[in-house]
A protein has these predicted regions:
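Functional transmembrane or membrane-interface alpha-helices that line membrane-embedded catalytic
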Residues: 1, 11-12, 20-28, 52-69, ...
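Short, conserved "active-site rim" segments that organize catalytic pockets and cofactor/ligand binding
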Residues: 8
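Membrane-interface helix caps and helix-loop-helix hairpins in membrane proteins
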Residues: 13-18, 37-46, 65
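Membrane-helix boundary elements
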Residues: 25-43
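Hydrophobic core segments of alpha-helical transmembrane domains in multi-pass membrane proteins
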Residues: 49-55, 73-76
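Catalytic glutamate of the conserved HExxH
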Residues: 75, 79, 83
Length: 144
């Protein structure tokens, strides 16, 4: 439902170009939620790895403002990141050294991974529209 709502609202209010920019930049706060969890759960040892991951996803988001495949790849790479957190926090696993990644609320990793997959699939279907919008704006000299 969250992915369907995101698609419906974004298509209702954004042009194709602005939609790409929005979802590319939205990857940054999506990754940033893990910093909020780090603070909330007081996982002091997790700050370095979590902040590094946010920086990596921020690069994908910033590049994705202009390059559609960077948005797709960024959201797809976020899926295993969600899965590792869910597995470590709730399945008794330790895919990474325990305490190096933050805890997450029950089910958050599954929710986020599902959202990321559905949105990446949607972005794949929209990539040609996004490219066409950028080409048209360059041809016409418009910015948005």
């Amino acid at each position: 439902m969250s992915a369907a709502g995101s698609v419906y609202i974004s298509r209702s209010i954004f042009s194709a170009k602005v939609e790409q920019i929005f979802f590319a930049l939205f990857l940054i706060p999506i990754a940033g939620f893990y910093l909020a969890f780090t603070a909330y759960f007081r996982d002091q040892d997790a700050w370095q790895l979590e902040a590094t991951a946010v920086a990596v996803f921020a690069v994908f988001g910033l590049v994705g403002v202009r390059v559609p495949f960077a948005v797709i790849i960024g959201y797809l790479l976020h899926i295993p990141w969600d899965a590792v957190h869910e597995f470590n926090a709730h399945a008794g696993g330790s895919l990474l050294v325990p305490r190096q990644i933050t805890s997450v609320p029950l089910g958050y990793g599954f929710f986020c991974a599902t959202y990321d997959f559905l949105m990446a699939t949607y972005f794949y279907t929209r990539r040609n529209h996004w490219r066409a919008a950028w080409r048209a704006s360059l041809r016409d000299g418009t910015t948005m």
